[in-house]
């Protein structure tokens, strides 16, 4: 009986010591901070701005044209012939619908491209995390936003940022 009790307590002690060893190989990284500090993020933002500049200016031109027609209708609608006013109202409605469709397509395309570029950058960050974790011997790397408390010595954000740059 004493041998069984001794073996059980030895097994429990082993289990607790294995957990303590695993905790030594956990690191924390702040992916959001790395993302914000990357110069590539600003370059991508400028690239997307240039990519969508023509469509944005076309939408602004369409909006200005639509606003001028609406103002003309409001200003001169009461003095216009009935057929002219009807034609202008139809034109305004058609332009408003066309503008809405183009604006929605623009927003969707812009959002899609932003997500593509963001995912490329996040993939680079993820690869850098794997490299740094492998070099420093960490088994688990957790995002700092998911951790309530961590020891500052186990934060590998700076190392990952250097690796990504």
Curated annotation (Swiss-Prot):
Family: Belongs to the Skp family.
Protein name: Chaperone protein Skp
Compartment(s) of residence: Periplasm
GO biological process, any: protein stabilization
Signal peptide: 1-22
Organism: Photorhabdus luminescens
Pfam families on file: OmpH (PF03938)
Gene name of the record: skp
Keywords noted in UniProt: Chaperone, Periplasm, Signal
Stretch list, region Lipopolysaccharide binding: 102-113
PANTHER family (UniProt xref): CHAPERONE PROTEIN SKP (PTHR35089:SF1)
Organism taxonomic ancestry: Bacteria, Pseudomonadati, Pseudomonadota, Gammaproteobacteria, Enterobacterales
Described purpose of this protein according to its UniProt entry: Molecular chaperone that interacts specifically with outer membrane proteins, thus maintaining the solubility of early folding intermediates during passage through the periplasm.
A single Gene Ontology CC term: periplasmic space
Listed GO MF terms: unfolded protein binding
Subunit structure: Homotrimer.
